[in-house]
């Protein structure tokens, strides 16, 4: 029996009001809670002892906060807004555009929605059910990828959709999927073409897609520390155990309010980013980091892991694998490693470690082993392409993962050589016609 319940609070697109978060933290800290966490879908997660639940619920209800307990029936909307300005520069998609779309989503989605710039790989493009990716060439138009619920079927929409119709089409698609669940929900034969035809009756601003979208290559930026952009700074904070001390977050919120920062952001890496720090306030932020001993320079091979939410087993396995890779001094730049411990959960990864029982008993099992799966072209925005290694016991897993990482570099080394050869042939004046 669980002695702890998890309260989930969504923040659309990972945009968090400092004053709103501060009020939540004040309320939950009255029950002597010390830590909160952030999830893969940029949501706030609060672990509460059963005996404190009634008090916490009353506090959140007083604030008018919408929340779920031990459920995710209404998933948060994921967006690349946290990367805007700092990791994404050459784009038509501005912070105001994100916010206008969020305002138009005037219902509470039951399907997972991702809203992403195409010119980035900091946030996942296709881990939602309704995945909007900004057109790299058509201003205010979006490509749409449907991943049917409880399946790995991905369908690229035949039209590109104007920003003003993103919310309405999202709502219409959700209505159709749930109204005809036998066709579109947990059905490996779901038809994207049929869903497309069923939405055409709506009054939406769209135009025919000229060509399929080419997904961007995966390059994870270093997302922690105090870093300069334009004439300001951004601060990224990662916690190894995923736990953010409430006292620290409260002071961070107050400092945001004091210095005129209107929002902070949660990210799909279970971190926070604070943008818009002025030069004159940088010292204050450094003092706050010093006060709470916030380490800012973790190894890249730790920062590129994604693990299931609410999974201590996944987190412990991550630490085990990171230690092995560190001890071996293995290079992991450019690789996103995921750990999946639950059936049909969605984890963003180039290389996925999937835990499974040899003997399944209901929702549990006995004698767990691990598969290592690789995405197409090792791009985490693509679907799984092949199994690198299957049924590994834990004592062999770390070495098998190291070998999978080596295969990543071997693959990219070969493709880069091919690209270089092709480029030279095209550019050489002596090449045969």
Label for each model-derived stretch:
Residues 1-10, 427-433:
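N-terminal intrinsically disordered, low-complexity tails enriched in polar/charged
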Residues 3-150, 236-362:
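Small-residue-enriched alpha-helical segments and adjacent helix-cap loops
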Residues 17-18, 49-51, 93-94, 161-166, ...:
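General structural signal for secondary-structure boundaries
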Residues 36-38, 46, 182-183, 191, ...:
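Aromatic-residue detector
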Residues 105-202, 359-433:
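Mobile "lid/hinge" segments at catalytic clefts and subdomain interfaces of large enzymes
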Residues 177-270, 275-278:
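Long, internal scaffold/assembly segments composed of regular secondary structure
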Residues 210-219, 246-249, 254-256, 314-315, ...:
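N-terminal secretory/membrane-targeting helices
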């Amino acid at each position: 029996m669980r002695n702890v319940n998890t309260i989930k609070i969504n923040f659309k697109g990972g945009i968090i009001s400092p004053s709103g978060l501060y009020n939540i933290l004040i309320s939950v800290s009255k029950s002597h809670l010390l830590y909160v966490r952030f999830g893969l879908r940029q949501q706030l997660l609060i672990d509460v002892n059963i005996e404190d639940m009634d008090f916490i619920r009353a506090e959140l209800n007083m604030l008018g906060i919408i929340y779920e307990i031990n459920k995710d029936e209404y998933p948060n909307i994921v967006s690349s807004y946290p990367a805007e300005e700092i990791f994404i520069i050459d784009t038509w998609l501005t912070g105001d555009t994100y916010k206008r779309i969020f305002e138009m989503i005037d219902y509470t989605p039951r399907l997972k929605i991702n809203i992403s710039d195409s010119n980035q790989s900091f946030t996942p493009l296709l881990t939602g059910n309704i995945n909007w990716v900004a057109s790299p060439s058509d201003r205010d138009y979006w490509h749409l990828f449907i991943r049917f619920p409880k399946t790995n079927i991905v369908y690229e929409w035949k039209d590109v959709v104007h920003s003003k119709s993103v919310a309405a089409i999202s709502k219409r698609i959700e209505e159709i999927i749930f109204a005809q669940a036998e066709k579109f929900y947990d059905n490996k034969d779901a038809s994207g073409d049929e869903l497309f035809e069923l939405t055409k009756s709506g009054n939406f601003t769209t135009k025919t897609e000229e060509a399929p979208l080419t997904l961007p290559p995966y390059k994870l930026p270093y997302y922690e520390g105090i870093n300069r952009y334009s004439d300001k700074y951004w601060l990224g904070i990662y916690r190894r155990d995923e736990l953010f001390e409430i006292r620290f977050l409260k002071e961070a919120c107050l400092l945001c309010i004091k210095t005129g920062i209107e929002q902070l952001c949660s990210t799909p890496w279970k971190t926070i980013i604070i943008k818009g720090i002025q030069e004159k306030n940088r010292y204050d932020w450094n003092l706050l980091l010093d006060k709470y001993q916030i380490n800012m320079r973790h190894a890249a091979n730790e920062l590129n892991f994604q693990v299931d939410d609410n999974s201590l087993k996944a987190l412990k396995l991550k630490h085990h694998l990171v230690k092995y890779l560190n001890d071996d001094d293995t290079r992991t730049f450019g690789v996103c490693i995921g750990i999946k411990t639950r059936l049909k959960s969605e984890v963003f990864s180039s290389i996925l470690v999937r835990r499974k029982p040899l003997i399944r008993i209901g929702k549990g099992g006995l004698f767990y082993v691990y598969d290592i799966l690789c995405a197409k072209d090792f791009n985490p925005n693509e679907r799984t392409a092949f199994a690198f290694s299957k049924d590994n016991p834990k004592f062999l897993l770390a070495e098998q993962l190291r070998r999978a990482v080596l295969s990543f570099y071997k693959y990219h080394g070969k493709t880069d050589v091919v690209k270089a050869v092709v480029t030279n042939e095209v550019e050489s004046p002596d090449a045969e016609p």
